[in-house]
């Protein structure tokens, strides 16, 4: 952290966003990707093996897990880089309470940045008029102001 770090903003960010988004945590002996959403897909895998490949794995001692980024905040993998960029900006003092973040986006990254509104920051997304209405809705639901280009 630097002298200019907004510690109150960093604390809110870590509690409300960072703790819920997969990110690399480095300890003295380990490196762990925290909060990665895994779903047990064993039953589906066995059914697929039986149906598609005619393999009977019912008695096989195995577990199959899938990484399901659709279960992340915002439902998109784009929340990962957004959270890392936000974390770096807060830690280095580049992003502080009361500031506005402006992003040109076609959707998911802007939606992920919209999480900043939960921290009391303003987010403006510069978007194409041709963007799908569903994306506009998600941006607005996240309290992100949109400006059509």
Task: Please report, for each region that a protein language model flagged, where it lies by residue.
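PLP-dependent amino-acid enzyme catalytic core
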Residues: 1-149
């Amino acid at each position: 952290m630097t002298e200019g770090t907004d510690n109150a903003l960093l604390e809110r960010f870590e509690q409300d966003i960072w703790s819920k988004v997969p990110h690399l945590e480095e300890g003295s002996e380990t490196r762990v990707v925290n909060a990665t959403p895994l779903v047990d897909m064993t039953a589906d895998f066995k059914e697929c093996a039986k149906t598609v490949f005619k393999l009977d794995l019912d008695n096989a001692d195995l577990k199959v897990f899938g990484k399901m980024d659709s279960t992340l905040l915002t439902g998109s993998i784009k929340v990962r880089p957004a959270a890392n960029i936000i974390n770096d900006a807060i830690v280095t003092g580049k992003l502080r309470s009361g500031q506005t973040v402006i992003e040109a986006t076609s959707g998911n990254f802007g939606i992920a940045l919209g999480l900043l509104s939960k921290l009391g920051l303003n987010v403006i997304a510069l978007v194409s008029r041709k963007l799908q209405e569903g994306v506009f809705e998600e941006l607005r639901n996240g309290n992100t102001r949109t400006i059509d280009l």
